[in-house]
Amino acid sequence: MNYLIVISFALLLMTSVESGRDAYIADSENCTYFCGSNPYCNDLCTENGAKSGYCQWAGRYGNACWCIDLPDKVPIRIPGPCRGR
């Protein structure tokens, strides 16, 4: 019985769970995507696997795209400088 529990727990840990997060989507240089309209951001976010997105006006990084439920594999804006501009 204990072996069954241990094996079940091991299988649970080995399965990859794709989680999502809400964040500013970023390019490879840690720069946000500048925006002026919600449809632009929604398209950008959904093309990258998010549920939706919108333009966050006058936010922490200026006018930038904010994505809802963005997959872990997509880069997000992290603290530090934007290296591309």
Curated annotation (Swiss-Prot):
Which stretch is the leader sequence? 1-19
* A GO cellular-component term linked to this record: extracellular region
Name the Pfam families for this protein.
Toxin_3
Disulphide bonds in the chain: C31-C82, C35-C55, C41-C65, C45-C67
**Keyword Secreted found:** yes
Name the residues that span the membrane.
Answer: none
The biological process GO terms on file are: defense response
The UniProt GO MF terms for this protein read: sodium channel inhibitor activity; toxin activity
Keywords noted in UniProt: Disulfide bond, Neurotoxin, Secreted, Signal, Toxin
The record's subcellular location field reads: Secreted
Summarize tissue expression: Expressed by the venom gland.
Does this UniProt record's set of keywords contain Coiled coil? no
The protein's matches in InterPro entries, at most eight in alphabetical order, are given as: LCN-type_CS_alpha_beta_dom, Scorpion_toxin-like, Scorpion_toxin-like_sf, Scorpion_toxinL, Scorpion_toxinL/defensin
Record-annotated LCN-type CS-alpha/beta domain positions: 21-83
* Primary role: This protein markedly relaxes the rat carbachol-precontracted anococcygeus muscle. This relaxation is inhibited by the inhibitor of nitric oxide (NO) synthase, N-nitro-L-arginine methyl ester (L-NAME), suggesting that the response induced by this protein is NO-mediated.
- Domain topic, free-text comment: Has the structural arrangement of an alpha-helix connected to antiparallel beta-sheets by disulfide bonds (CS-alpha/beta).
Please state which protein family the record places this protein in.
Answer: Belongs to the long (4 C-C) scorpion toxin superfamily. Sodium channel inhibitor family. Alpha subfamily.
Q: What is this protein called?
A: Makatoxin-2
- Source organism (scientific name): Olivierus martensii (Manchurian scorpion)
